[in-house]
């Protein structure tokens, strides 16, 4: 019922070769290749893409460098610069109170701006960002601030101990709030 309320598909055949449901994308932590795939990448190194903002050819880059670029993140998430800033400022996405601020924000070009995190910390942020963004799309009448507050009120702030079942419970509670 929660998946239906949120408009998230639930695929009956999952597993190693099966399709991934929207419910799984919202509830399961993604790392490594599974995380890169949600952002449209199939490898973690030797990445060559055209920067979506500047048109510059980026070659032989590692995934953490590519996905730390604000121009790539806004393109891959569909968020505007302002929306990305708001999402990174949330406790849920950043992983701590006060959130993150984009580095080199004073630049006029998103291709020069970066998410100020590296390696495993960046991976954690990117995992929560993709789930937050997907959930935001499922709740189009909610602002980023409203979704952030609702997640916090449902106990959705994540830690090392957070399991997929905990994330499912948060989504069930969010579906209840939506129905009110």
Language-model-detected regions and their locations in the chain:
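Hydrophobic/aromatic interaction determinants used to assemble and anchor large protein complexes
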Residues: 1-180
């Amino acid at each position: 019922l929660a998946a239906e309320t949120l408009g998230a598909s639930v695929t009956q055949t999952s597993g190693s070769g099966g399709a991934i449901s929207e419910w799984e994308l919202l509830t399961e932590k993604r790392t490594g290749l599974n995380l890169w795939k949600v952002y449209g990448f199939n490898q973690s190194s030797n990445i060559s893409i055209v920067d979506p903002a500047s048109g510059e050819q980026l070659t032989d880059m590692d995934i953490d460098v590519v996905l730390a670029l604000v121009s790539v993140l806004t393109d891959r998430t569909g968020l505007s610069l302002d929306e990305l800033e708001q999402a990174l400022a949330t406790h849920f996405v950043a992983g701590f109170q006060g959130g993150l601020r984009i580095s080199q924000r004073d630049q006029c070009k998103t291709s020069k701006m970066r998410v100020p995190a590296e390696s495993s910390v960046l991976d954690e942020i990117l995992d929560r960002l993709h789930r937050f963004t997907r959930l935001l799309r499922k709740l189009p009448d909610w602002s980023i601030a409203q979704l952030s507050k609702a997640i916090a009120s449902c106990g959705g702030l994540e830690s090392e101990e957070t399991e997929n079942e905990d994330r499912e419970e948060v989504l069930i509670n969010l579906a209840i709030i939506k129905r009110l």
